[in-house]
Amino acid sequence: MNVQLILRSLTYKEEQRVIIRPIGERVLLKHQKKEEVTKGGIYIPESARQEKKEGIVIAVGTFEDGKELPLKKGDHVIYGGYQADEIEIDDEKYIFVDFKDILATVVEE
């Protein structure tokens, strides 16, 4: 079963309820923002910030045989790879990542 994301508006449409469901072995992530200030309080200019490849799982697709991918909504993941399709909804950045590019889940103890 796919996890579904219901959004109230897209940047290119007026208030409309939509369901976004990843197709195939893809995962929809809410992109984790880059740090703007260090823990010591030093501001990091945008030109010096490295892209943080972490996100929160919003929705997952399925394997070719229909079985669920071993991720669930809310999982914190680290991903790699060079290909990710970005979308922006209500000023929030979301990305579609291939499941094979998910490197790890982050579990806080």
UniProtKB/Swiss-Prot annotation:
One of its GO terms (cellular component) is cytoplasm. InterPro entries: Chaperonin_GroES, Chaperonin_GroES_sf, Chaprnonin_Cpn10_CS, GroES-like_sf. Its main location: cytoplasm. It holds the Pfam family Cpn10. It comes from the Archaea. GO terms for biological process: chaperone cofactor-dependent protein refolding. GO terms for molecular function: ATP binding; metal ion binding; protein folding chaperone; protein-folding chaperone binding; unfolded protein binding. Keywords: Chaperone, Cytoplasm. It is found in: Cytoplasm. Belongs to the GroES chaperonin family. Heptamer of 7 subunits arranged in a ring. Interacts with the chaperonin GroEL. Together with the chaperonin GroEL, plays an essential role in assisting protein folding. The GroEL-GroES system forms a nano-cage that allows encapsulation of the non-native substrate proteins and provides a physical environment optimized to promote and accelerate protein folding. GroES binds to the apical surface of the GroEL ring, thereby capping the opening of the GroEL channel. This is Co-chaperonin GroES. It comes from Methanosarcina acetivorans (strain ATCC 35395 / DSM 2834 / JCM 12185 / C2A). The gene is groES.
